[in-house]
Amino acid sequence: MSATTYLELSEADGGAHKFYEVRVDDTEVTITYGRIGEQGQVRSATFADHAKALKAAEKKIGEKVRKGYAPAVKGMRQRRSVSRRQIVSTRSTATQAPVLWRFASGAPAFGIFIGEDRAWVGNEDGDVYTLTHDGQVTGRFGLPDAVKCIVADDFWIYAGCDDGQVYDLGAKVPRVAYEIAEDVDIYWLDIHDGVLGVSDRQGRVTVVDHEDEFQWSVPASGDSAWMVRCAPEGVFHGHSRGVTHYTGRGHRAWHADTVGSVLFGWQERDAVFAGTSRGRVHRFAKSDGRMTGDYRCDAAVFSCATSPDGEFVFAGDNQSSVYCFAADGTRLWKLATGCGSAFSMQYRDERLYLVTTDGSLACLDASPAAVRAAEQGQLPQRQDIKAGAIARVEATAEVEVVSHAAPGEGVVVECVQEGGRIRVHVVSDGYDRSWGVQFPKNIRVPGARYLVTEVVTSAGGSFYRTRGEIKRLR
């Protein structure tokens, strides 16, 4: 005796396109779920008899229907459109850079973030690894699709993926923080104080708030928008026709032309930087868009970064070379990576970290002494690192359930149905209960209470954000 129920959730604003399939085969219940058009994840359970299996299946189906899922015909909706950055990478003829260590992530790597204690790398296989600054592997997350980029927003670390979801990596288990509309062919994203900016293939920039609710979207004069940088001043958007600054409400503040299409963007406190297809890195003042620096490379620039406040400017081209410039535009050096072309990069404490076309996270010694030695053929002993057998912690909607919260143990929040949305508010003493809480979307259940490690006020002071672990209270 077998029966299958297939459901889909497709929100009117394009925020979610997911499926949920429940199959009952005698005493076994198999649940498959995920993004429409993808294979999804599978969970199975066996029950004492067919009646108990049916009852369990009906309960799961009922839960999803209450969340807005509805019966559908499998295969009618198609997978979201995905564009992946392609670099025809050639071997550099420059002198080899002083590489201290190189980690093999296993697939072309796009995502990178270098924090105070850890380095993060995300690749096309959906693997996100954490390492110490000396290259020791400390953790591994598994995401359902290829990683587009990794971004930091104060304490919070996020990974944007080809499945259209943005995952919060700040706890032991990855959780869905944002779901990007199905019609957005994502190129890049950035987050500031919970506000997410997304640039896409069509050249649009789209902004959503901490509740993952649409705020505004603006079509660009160009296409292929590989740059979006969110800041207190608004959003800086780079595409085939240059760089445009929009205020926080979506009004155009200024536009600056570039020599070539923008392929990458970086920002510092007072300036934004745009790497282009014609071998330039342009520096623009955030205040008015004036070009205050121009840095010339020998091939298309697919990544760039700076030291604090732009004292030094770094760039990576599609010929497996990296460059360093002084702020005034003087080229200080050009060296070979030895591990492909850099999809992205970040500088920290005289080290330049790259993620590359061959899947490496490479750490270069960018100190003047090390560079001078490399130019004379004296290189450090490079350490080659592999992941080994470290466990892969998968993204999940499952939450540990506890019976109660001990006095002083964390903060209690509650999910409340408000109109067509499920909001979250703090119920513990000492907090403003009218404020919303930024909280993972796919674990919200109306009426449920959760225990979170910590709740902090957003930088803008209008909502709360959770930090640490999340447990559901029974």
Feature names for model-found ranges:
Residues D429-V445:
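Beta-strand/loop nucleic-acid-binding surfaces
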Residues T457-R474:
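OB-fold/S1-family single-stranded nucleic acid-binding modules
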Residues A107-F113, D145-D154, V184-I191, D223-C230, ...:
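Repeated scaffold domains used in trafficking and secretory/extracellular systems
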Residues R85-A107:
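A short helix->beta-strand "capping" segment at the edge of beta-propeller domains
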Residues A395-G420:
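Structural detector for short beta-strands of small beta-barrel domains
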Residues L100-G126:
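Beta-strand-rich domains and repeat architectures in extracellular enzymes and scaffolds
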Residues C339-A387:
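Blade-level signature of beta-propeller repeat domains, shared across WD40, Kelch, NHL, RCC1
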Residues P98-A104, Q136-F141, V173-I180, E213-P219, ...:
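A short beta-strand motif characteristic of beta-propeller blades
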